[in-house]
């Protein structure tokens, strides 16, 4: 599970422009990183341009998913992640980032803003924090703990069944042992009966 890009954009009347972004392109080769970053910016702008205001959607491109949230006030966010990353966590992140951005950056700066002029520096920390959704999102953490508990419970049940099979063997052996003990007792009793002292 990996996040590659987190962007905040403004959807204007005629054009979508980037306000701020953060990228993690460390998994790509050094010579591809700038091209990959440009492509992510282009894709983010294109997806926001084609999305309606007040909508959330996910777009699949090869092994990547682009999650977009365009608010009614024209502020938009895009997360680019791999297929394994939970979409719910992406939309939670987008909602949190856009809410924080809208409180820290004046609305009048959105239409004319650019990455150089917008003073908002939390995207890099959010991108690194949300790399592991279990650590960043409480719901994912609970789900992971439930999955682990289910695995432990399943393993415990399997070991109990194995132990149960061994207990069955012991029970059958004890039944055999009980029969032999009874036979031994009867035989011993018969032999000792001649030696009764009166």
Swiss-Prot record:
Q: EC number(s)?
A: 2.3.1.-
Specify the enzyme's EC class, one word: transferase
Q: Where is the lipid attached (S-palmitoyl cysteine)?
A: 194
Q: Which Pfam families match?
A: Longin, Synaptobrevin
Where does the record place the v-SNARE coiled-coil homology domain? Answer: 138-198
> Where the protein is mainly located, per its record?
cytoplasm
Disulphide bonds in the chain: none
Please give the Gene Ontology molecular function terms for this protein: protein-cysteine S-palmitoyltransferase activity; SNAP receptor activity
Residues that make up the propeptide removed upon maturation: 196-198
Cysteine methyl ester carried by residues: 195
Q: Where in the cell is it found?
A: Cytoplasm, Cytosol; Cytoplasmic vesicle membrane; Golgi apparatus membrane
Q: Which UniProt keywords apply?
A: Coiled coil, Cytoplasm, Cytoplasmic vesicle, ER-Golgi transport, Golgi apparatus, Lipoprotein, Membrane, Methylation, Palmitate, Prenylation, Protein transport, Transferase, Transport
How does the record describe the protein's post-translational processing?
A: Palmitoylated; catalyzes its own palmitoylation. Palmitoylation is required for Golgi targeting. Farnesylation is required for Golgi targeting.
Q: Which GO terms describe its cellular component?
A: cytoplasmic vesicle membrane; cytosol; endoplasmic reticulum; Golgi apparatus; Golgi membrane; plasma membrane
Tell me the SUPFAM superfamilies matching this sequence.
Answer: SNARE fusion complex (SSF58038), SNARE-like (SSF64356)
Identify where the record puts lipid attachment of type S-farnesyl cysteine.
195
Q: Which residues form the Longin domain?
A: 8-127
Sequence similarity: Belongs to the synaptobrevin family.
What this chain does, per the entry, is described as: Vesicular soluble NSF attachment protein receptor (v-SNARE) mediating vesicle docking and fusion to a specific acceptor cellular compartment. Functions in endoplasmic reticulum to Golgi transport; as part of a SNARE complex composed of GOSR1, GOSR2 and STX5. Functions in early/recycling endosome to TGN transport; as part of a SNARE complex composed of BET1L, GOSR1 and STX5. Has a S-palmitoyl transferase activity.
Q: What is this protein called?
A: Synaptobrevin homolog YKT6-B
Source species, please?
A: Xenopus laevis (African clawed frog)
What's the name of its gene?
Answer: ykt6-b
């Amino acid at each position: 599970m990996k996040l590659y890009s987190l962007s905040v954009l403004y959807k204007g009347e005629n054009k979508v422009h980037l306000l701020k972004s953060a990228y993690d392109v460390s998994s790509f080769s050094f010579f591809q990183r700038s091209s990959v970053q440009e492509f992510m910016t282009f894709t983010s702008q294109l997806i926001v341009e084609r999305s309606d205001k007040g909508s959330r959607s996910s777009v699949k491109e090869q092994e990547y998913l682009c999650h977009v949230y365009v608010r009614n006030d024209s502020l938009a966010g895009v997360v680019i992640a791999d297929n394994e990353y939970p979409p719910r966590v992406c939309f939670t992140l987008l909602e949190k980032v856009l809410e924080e951005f809208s409180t820290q950056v004046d609305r009048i700066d959105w239409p004319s803003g650019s990455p150089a002029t917008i003073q908002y520096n939390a995207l890099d920390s959010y991108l690194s924090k949300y790399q592991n959704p279990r650590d960043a999102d409480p719901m994912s953490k609970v789900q992971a703990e439930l999955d682990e508990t289910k695995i432990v419970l399943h393993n415990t049940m399997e070991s109990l069944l194995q132990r149960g099979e061994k207990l069955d063997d012991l029970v059958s052996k004890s039944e055999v042992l009980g029969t032999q003990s009874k036979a031994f007792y009867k035989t011993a009793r018969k032999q000792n009966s001649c030696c009764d002292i009166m």
